Curated annotation (Swiss-Prot):
Protein name: UBA-like domain-containing protein 2-A
Annotated gene: ubald2-a
Family statement: Belongs to the UBALD family.
Domain of life per record: Eukaryota
InterPro entries named in the record: UBA-like_sf, UBA_8, UBALD1/2
Segments of this protein annotated with the region Disordered: 120-166
Length: 166
């Protein structure tokens, strides 16, 4: 059985065009033939046709794109909803569920991975790793609470006592 490679290539291009544009196969074939099988040219023609209706295009039925990632069901409505979301985020405080869900990190997010602000010690340190007890000479700076007060030595004595118990 011999298959004409040119026909096969055209069929593959038609299928790709249908997937990319969301139109019918016969319309894809017409556009590709008109563009001399130049995929990008035909795709541009398809989207320019669907965006700029003119009198000559009303004689044949136009196939509008289906719901593809490139073409949402109703693009103006999607844009309006997106702009409302942005506006409502900036106008509402973060206690509203819509704004907090839109801006909140996921539940397993650890906010302490980031560095502390300059000229300020961290208020919380992550727990020591299981291998830390092997390295007694590595001491982490002690957190200061409240942030603007000076350490009195009490927490350091407690840490020294804990190190002695290990």
């Amino acid at each position: 059985m011999s298959v004409n490679m040119e026909d096969l290539r055209h069929q593959v291009m038609i299928n790709q065009f249908v997937l990319a544009a969301g139109c019918a196969a016969d319309q894809a074939k017409q556009l590709l033939q008109a563009a001399h099988w130049q995929f990008e040219t035909a795709l541009s023609a398809f989207f320019q046709e669907s965006n700029v209706p003119s009198a000559q295009h009303h004689t044949h039925m136009m196939c509008t794109p289906s719901n593809t990632p490139a073409t949402p069901p109703n693009f103006p409505d999607a844009l309006a909803m997106f702009s409302k979301l942005r506006t409502s985020e900036s106008l509402q405080n973060s206690s509203s569920p819509a704004a907090s869900n839109a801006c909140s990190p996921p539940g397993n997010f650890n906010p302490y991975w980031a560095s502390s602000p300059p000229n300020q010690q961290p208020v919380w340190l992550p727990p020591a790793s299981p291998t830390t007890h092997l390295h007694h000479h590595h001491h982490h700076p002690q957190p200061v609470w409240p942030p603007n007060s000076q350490p009195t030595g009490g927490p350091q004595k407690a840490m020294a006592a804990m190190d002695g118990q290990r």
